[in-house]
Curated annotation (Swiss-Prot):
Binding site for substrate: 91-94, 113, 237, 309-311, 560
Pathway: Purine metabolism; IMP biosynthesis via de novo pathway; 5-amino-1-(5-phospho-D-ribosyl)imidazole from N(2)-formyl-N(1)-(5-phospho-D-ribosyl)glycinamide: step 1/2
Residues annotated as binding ATP: 49, 88, 520, 557
Protein's recorded name: Phosphoribosylformylglycinamidine synthase subunit PurL
Length: 766
């Protein structure tokens, strides 16, 4: 093993001169080229979170249901009755920008490995997607290929894609966001951890062969996208969902033998990351021989083996003497399996290639003792925020109950509503989710578009061919959702991030679930930009506060920085993945009206709304300005609690979050989902008409209630939400329009279901 003799090209490794000096200090010498390549990927933002780690430590991470928190491959929560749920979110933003099909597909494959590596069988997938305007053919192609990639991997591997969200904004042009969340139920007696243990225990390489695909993928994901980003296509991994399915089954079968001491999937930074993290977490070392790694290409150098991110690969630490037993399982599933290393006492990562030791570095130097940057925080909001907060809604064209009076015409409220429903962010995503298999495994209770959150039956998937456990054995269910609003966070990072957590919990409450915990994906620009770092820091504060208030600890997540191209950064976009528990499947709710004559109520207050950052401002006036409404977390808890109680008492027949698009859009969505009209009167108040109809805010839920239950329902509301609920009207029939009037009965808008459908299903039409 020799040291580098010439000055290294630090830029190629994504390292600064100061970081190189830290490496020299930790090693007591210069790293050789192979070691330097390993440090380059392990010290990248994608792997070590050097800019975000100080901010993440403020998140609440413990709770009575938390079994596994941050630090493992995924978080785990206790659902009771011996059921444990693993869940996690990951991003594949940069790869999807340059190779959308494979970038998105391998994002699905990677998050599934995080789940089953713990010993959990994957039961559901969700995704959160952001694209630039679909009028641009490139953005439309990106979207189509991303959706195709997600559908391909999920459908082939046999895991249903049950929900998610899609937003469209110019800031995501050329820099799409592809965040994927997976859920799984534990099948092993205990969680399979990733810390290597037992000196002398063999290390098994299992799964697919290793090639040159995905080399330096972690470094690629830790830098800004270049204008000529297509040259980075070799950094994008290539997945095989059929092989991935075999890997799921082989791993779960191997874990059931209890011969596996530790497991780690090979994702970002491949063999480098897996060996370093397993050794560092266990306080031991790993000796690894690259000559024993099954390769799909000849002539690969040591650094290529180490940095390859070929998919569907795992490292296992196995009890000594039981390696043959475990390898036989993988061979039977048609997978590679070989003894490629062993656990050693000295806490080093020692890599051998062609009979020589090519790497010998402390495991902690690669995985734990990495750079950390605590950057100064702006003393006050940046200029763009201060300017936005000065915006006055009175500068908009005048409006009355007829509509908006523009210089050349009056835009009726019916036209405004239809224009909003046709905007890609609010429009139906049926064209997208129709491509996903959301029924495979036969546990999806609420399909995409039916409710504010996905609902998945809790039923063991451990059965033989031709054997299916009875449905009546499943009483409980899991609810899951993904939520984020980049515009709100751009205009107010602290309140916008709080609102994302609150909306996720609200969506779970709307289907009848108790919110349990979250996983978060922080999508931001370059932290080296003081404005972006300020956005990131305040968003983390907002998430932490909301999670504490709502009792939803953070069990893990992902940070994706440097989401920018040239001088154009995306909006700061934290995406919250939240899971909840439904104690009894008899008491769940969809978002659509159920019965003609049901009473329509609004829980919460219209006074908590704002036009700042609204879809109304963006779609009608092409403005992104103002200040989003602050989140009253105490009111949020009471509104959600009232909704859940009403569902479990059998009073509430439908429930729908009132957020993006405001009250008028929420009413239209309930009509569309239920196939029925409604007649509604706005409560008396002093709000301008545009804010009353389309203002956005938190802590509001639209529900429909059995009229026979009006008395106990309203008595309960008055005790729990005094003065903060309104009876708006009643549900109509399939032939009735959506009618909104003033409190005095004067007409505001009347739109037929056919017109609503024509607008709502137009944005993503085939």
């Amino acid at each position: 093993m020799t040291s580098a003799s010439a000055p290294p090209d630090l830029k190629a490794h994504g390292l600064s001169p100061e970081e190189y000096r830290q490496i020299q200090q930790q090693l007591g010498r210069d790293p050789n080229p192979t070691e330097l390549a390993m440090f380059g990927v392990m010290w990248s933002e994608h792997c070590c979170y050097k800019n975000s780690r100080p901010l993440l430590k403020h998140f609440p991470t413990t709770g009575e249901r938390v079994v596994v928190g941050p630090g493992e491959n995924a978080g785990v929560v206790d659902l009771g009755d011996g059921d444990w749920l693993a869940f996690k979110i990951e991003s594949h933003n940069h790869p999807s920008a340059v190779e959308p099909f494979q970038g998105a597909a391998t994002g699905v494959g990677g998050i599934l490995r995080d789940i089953f590596t713990l010993g959990a069988r994957p039961i559901a997938l969700l995704n959160s997607l952001r694209f630039g305007p679909l009028t641009d053919p490139r953005n439309r192609r990106l979207m189509a290929r991303v959706v195709e990639g997600i559908a391909h991997y999920g459908n082939c591997v046999g895991v249903p894609t049950v929900g998610g969200e899609v937003a469209v904004d110019p800031c995501y042009s050329g820099n799409p966001l592809v965040n994927v969340m997976a859920l799984g139920l534990l099948e092993t007696p205990a969680v399979v951890k990733s810390a290597a243990r037992g000196v002398g225990n063999p290390i098994l390489y299992v799964g697919a062969t290793t090639g040159r695909d995905g080399i330096r993928g972690a470094s690629f994901a830790s830098a800004e996208l270049k204008e000529d980003a297509q040259q980075d296509r070799p950094a994008v991994q290539v997945g095989d969902p059929f092989l991935g399915k075999c890997l799921i089954e082989a791993c779960l079968e191997a874990f059931a033998t209890v011969a596996v001491v530790a497991a780690q999937d090979m994702g970002a930074a491949g063999i480098t990351c897996s060996t370093a993290e397993m050794a560092a977490k266990g306080g031991v070392g790993i000796r690894f021989d690259l000559d024993r790694v099954p390769a799909r290409e000849s002539g690969m150098a040591a650094w290529e083996y180490l940095l390859s991110e070929s998919q569907e690969r795992m490292l296992l630490v196995v009890q000594k003497g039981r390696e043959a037993e475990v390898m036989e399982i993988f061979h039977r599933w048609g997978l590679q399996a070989s003894v490629a290393g062993e656990v050693i006492a000295e806490p080093l990562v020692e890599i051998w290639h062609q009979g020589s030791c090519v790497v010998r570095v402390p495991a902690r130097a690669l995985a734990e003792d990495t750079p950390v940057y605590v950057r100064p925080l702006l003393p006050e909001p940046p200029e763009y925020v201060q300017a936005a907060w000065q915006w006055d809604p009175s500068t908009l064209p005048p409006c009355d109950r007829q509509g908006i009076h523009l210089p050349q015409k009056t835009l009726a409220w019916e036209q405004v509503l239809l224009q909003l429903l046709a905007s890609p962010t609010l429009a139906s995503k049926a064209w997208i989710y129709r491509q996903y298999d959301h029924q495979v495994q036969n546990n999806t209770v609420l399909w995409p578009g039916q409710g504010d959150a996905a609902v998945i039956r809790i039923r063991s998937q451990k059965f033989g061919v031709g054997e299916v456990p009875p449905l009546q054995a499943a009483r409980k269910a899991i609810a899951a959702t993904l939520d984020g609003n980049g515009r709100w966070v751009y205009l107010d990072p602290y309140e916008g991030a709080k609102a994302a957590v609150a909306e996720a919990a609200r969506n779970l409450s709307c289907v009848g679930a108790d919110p349990l915990a979250i996983t978060d994906n922080l999508n931001f620009g370059s932290p080296e930009n003081p404005v972006v770092y300020w956005q990131l820091a305040l968003a983390c504060r907002g998430i932490a506060e909301a999670c504490r208030a709502l009792g939803t600890p953070v069990t893990g997540g992902n940070v994706s920085l440097y989401n920018e191209k040239g001088s154009q950064a995306i909006y700061p976009t934290p995406v919250i993945g939240m899971v909840g528990l439904i104690p009894d499947l008899k008491f769940i709710c969809g978002q659509g009206w159920q019965q003609e004559g049901d009473l329509v109520y609004l829980l919460g207050s219209q006074a908590v709304t704002s036009l700042g950052g609204s879809e109304y401002l963006a779609a009608i006036y092409n403005k992104v300005t103002g200040r989003p409404a602050p989140v009253d977390l105490e009111l949020e808890k009471r509104v959600q609690g009232a909704c859940r109680h009403g569902i479990r008492q059998g009073w509430v027949r439908s429930a729908h979050d009132c957020s993006e698009g405001g009250l008028a859009v929420a009413l239209a969505e309930a009509c569309l989902s239920g196939g029925r009209g409604a007649s509604v009167s706005l409560a008396p108040g002093s709000l301008p008409w545009d804010q009353a109809l389309f203002g956005e805010g938190s802590s509001r839920i639209l529900v429909s209630v059995d009229p026979a239950q009006r008395s106990p329902w309203e008595a309960y509301l008055e005790s729990q939400l005094p003065g903060q609920w309104q009876l708006l009207g009643q549900v109509g029939g399939p032939a009735d329009p959506l009618v909104l009037t003033t409190a005095e009965g004067d007409p505001l808008l009347s739109v037929s279901l056919a017109a609503l459908q024509g607008a709502y299903y137009s944005a993503f039409a085939d």
